[in-house]
Amino acid sequence: MSYRDLRECIDLERGTEDVGLAAGRSQREKKRSYKDLLREEEEIAEQVRKSSKKRSKELDLFSGNELHKKKKKHSSDDYHADHSTDSAKKKKKTSLPSPSSSDTAMDLLKAITSPQADTSTTHPSKKPEKILATPISFSSPSQPPHKDYHKKSGEVSGDDSSHRSKKSKPLTLREPDGLRMKLIMSPNEKSEEEAVSPQGGPGHSDSASSKKNSKKLGREEIESRSSHKKHKKQSYTPRSGGTPDSASSTGGELDAGELVIDDSLRDMKKKKKSKKSKKKKDKHKDEKHKKHSKSKREHEVEQSQTQIASPGLPSPPPPPATTPPTSPPSIPLQPQALVTHTEEQSDKKKKKEDPEKPKKKNMSAYQVFSKEYRVSIIAEHPGIDFGELSKKLAEVWKQLPEKDKLVWKQKAQYLQHKQNKAEATTVKRKSSSSESAPKSKGSSSGLVSPNKKSPTSSVASFSTSPAKVPDTEPIDVAAHLQLLGESLSLIGHRLQETEGMVAVSGSLSVLLDSILCALGPLVCLTSHVPQLNACPKQILSNTLDNIAYVMPGL
């Protein structure tokens, strides 16, 4: 082979390689353009989502003009979308699966954009309209941020005119709180819409509807916010025989229509009524319970009174038939009312007296000593201060021998015992007097005759007060003897504990003191025997008081 032949072969091979490279480059460029288109569509979709979220938060009355401008641009882009065949074919491939569906979609698009579409559209053409809405939304890169807004305007322009001409049924909006609203169209608005739809072309009708929608959307949302702040989601019922009404289509009819409320918040009123009825029932139950408890108490008091009266006295005989039946029951009711009233008063007095009672204080030997010795110090030093007096008393108490301190201790114990005994006797007297009072009342109620002669006798029995009891009663004597026994037992325990011999003089003095402490109370018992009552009561009471100084072992 010559050099030329080799050069030609190499050139041919290079040419084929260049052709292959060019074909590969064209395919890559096609793929890149396809990918770029997909990316652009995704970016537009993201922009639509973001703007829809922002719009739902920041929509106000001033946003109507901006929406109107965007809608104008959008309608002009849709009107010229048929001329750009290359871009439409590529996007139909991405959105529509088969060529037959793309042909039908193009036919329907032409039918919608033509001025005769308002009368020719029927119910079977609903599904392809929904399919068409997706490719049209991606046709222009300068699309406004609402996909759904374009769908709603397209559907309303086709369907609303035919349905309003056929049927004038009111639109119904179903709110979540049970508030059902009817939108009745006024005749002026119907005539205006019928006049606008055939005269203006598709661009004019779209712009008019977009103006109404943009202005009245703001009003609708302000009303919905003021009426339902708590509920964010709103569910609307579809129209009979047509496509479901969107927020934009219904918002355009709120201004001209009359609003009729069917169910005005019945659920809220029912809840409030149920709460009020529950409160009333609870109050009624409490009042019944209180009345029932009061009646029970009164019944128990009456039963106790009848039981007290029945054992003491025989039951009165039944009244004869000739006597009138009204007079006997009125007589025994009076003492029962008196008893209940007195019992209530006594309960109140007890409640008042309980906090007023001072606590009992035990008398100490130093207190008894200071009480008696204070008089002598004041007599010696008139006008002495309380602080100096207390200091002198403390010094004298310290200088006292133990025997004298024991004597003062015994005296304090005796006085304490006497005080306790006096309180016990007063309590017994009160209880006995309180027991005797209902008995006398019961007897008086049992003995009451129709002539009413017994009240004077019952008053006389109440007026007699018990005589003042002297200090030399058998109870006092028994208390002194009990103290003597306790002191002697203490001395015996101490003698058992001590080791060694005990002085005879000490034992004799203890025995003599114990004899005196035993004989003194026994002499007081002679006052209760008339044959032996020779000593005056004052001397006997003084001896009982002085026994405390002689009591051994305390």
From Swiss-Prot:
SMART domains for the chain: HMG (SM00398)
Gene Ontology cellular-component annotations: nucleus
GO MF term set: DNA binding; protein kinase binding
GO BP, sorted A to Z: negative regulation of Wnt signaling pathway; Wnt signaling pathway
DNA-binding region: 359-427
PROSITE patterns registered for this protein in UniProt: HMG_BOX_2
Primary localization class, coarse: nucleus
Biased composition (Polar residues): 113-123, 236-251
Entry keywords, A to Z: Developmental protein, DNA-binding, Nucleus, Wnt signaling pathway
SUPFAM superfamilies (alphabetical): HMG-box
Comp. bias (Low complexity): 95-105, 433-445, 454-467
Binding partners and assembly: Interacts with nlk.2.
Protein's UniProt name: HMG box-containing protein 4
Lineage: Eukaryota, Metazoa, Chordata, Craniata, Vertebrata
